[in-house]
Every structure is written in C-alpha cells, then in structure tokens.
C-alpha cells in the first residue's frame, strides 16, 4: 500500500471492490467470517481501553463494519458513549439492527461516513480506534488529518492493522498532516492463541494541539 494520491478511475474501481465485499449479502458473510478472526484483536482493544481508566467520554471506531467492536466496548464500559462509522450503508444498517437487539441504543451511535470526511464536529472524541481498516485507505494524509480534527486535545488515536503495514509509511504520511511532531508509538502485538504477532498497533497521544 502506498500513500500517494490516486486517479479517479483507480479510486472508483477500489470503491466498487469494497462495495462488492461489504454490501448486501456480502455484509452478512463478512460478519460471520471476519468477526471470528478479529475477536482476539477486539479483546486487545478492550484491554488497552481499560488501561486508560476513563471515567466517561466518547470513543469512535473507524471502519466499524457490523459494529461488533463498538458493542463490545459499550458492554465493557457502561460510562462511555461509543460511535461507529463506516463507508458501507449496509454494514451500518446491520450494526444498528444488532445494537437494537442487544438494547444498547442509548449509548451507541452508528453513522455512514468516509474517513476522509468524517461526519463529526472538531474535537469530538477522547479515543479513536480503527482495526483492520487502514489497508483499505487509498491514501493516508487526509484520513490522518480528519482523525486529528475530531480528536480532543489529550485524546488517543490507535490504529491496529496487519503487521505488513510499515511504520515508515505512516511516518511519511504523518509529516504532511497536523500530526507532524506528535510522537507515534508502534509495536507488533500478539492476540489469542496465535504463536506469532500478526498485528501492528500505531498509537498517538495528543497532549495538546500546536
């Protein structure tokens, strides 16, 4: 994956591929397959959130898919308001259906939106997480700008993805965004019973805005 800008034709082709995967029956198939594979990673996110000892606040899951992680967070932390955003309207519809069944609507909200233009005001969230979504982003600079924009001063940004995502790629993109100068921590992480670390975690802590 590269962080360069892409042409409209290539971008349209990529979006068509994502629509095939994440709309209609594809959203149901995704829920029943990927959720089982990513459950250990979601448990790691819950553990990382618990370490913050948040007393209330708002958490955003970017690329939420069917909203499994959002509901996991809402159940684990009753004092948090949890939001999920995804480009796929079918995924968001599925997430809302599941949330209604689990009676979590009072503290959970799902929105259709693009990581390059998030549907939230500036400085909205205490923590933003994204799991296994970054490798779908066709460029990194604008998504990082948007994540910075909606994060509160003192907020945390955590991006979890496959280990093949290189830190140098993120650092290069960060240099062209308001995140420049903010320290990025990264580490390989193990989850579940996997003997090897198959995921990488990128983390930022915005102590204050420049």
Regions found by a protein language model. Give the residues of each.
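Conserved SAM-binding loop of SAM-dependent methyltransferases across substrates and taxa
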Residues: 66-77
């Amino acid at each position: 994956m590269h962080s360069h800008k892409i042409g409209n034709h290539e971008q349209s082709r990529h979006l068509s591929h994502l629509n095939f995967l994440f709309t209609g029956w594809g959203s149901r198939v995704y829920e029943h397959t990927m959720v089982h594979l990513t459950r250990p990673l979601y448990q790691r996110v819950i553990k990382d959130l618990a370490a913050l000892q948040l007393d209330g606040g708002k958490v955003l899951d970017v690329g939420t898919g069917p909203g499994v992680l959002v509901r996991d967070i809402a159940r684990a932390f009753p004092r948090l308001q949890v939001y999920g955003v995804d480009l796929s309207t079918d995924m968001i519809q599925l997430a809302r259906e599941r949330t209604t069944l689990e009676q979590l609507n009072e503290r959970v909200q799902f929105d259709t939106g693009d990581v390059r233009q998030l549907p939230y005001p500036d400085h909205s969230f205490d923590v933003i997480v994204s799991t296994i979504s970054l490798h779908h982003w066709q460029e990194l600079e604008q998504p990082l700008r948007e994540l910075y924009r909606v994060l509160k001063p003192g907020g945390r940004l955590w991006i979890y993805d496959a280990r093949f995502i290189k830190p140098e790629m993120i650092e290069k993109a960060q240099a062209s965004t308001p995140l420049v100068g903010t320290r990025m921590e990264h580490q390989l992480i193990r989850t579940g019973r996997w003997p090897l670390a198959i995921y990488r975690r990128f983390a930022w802590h915005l102590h204050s805005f420049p």
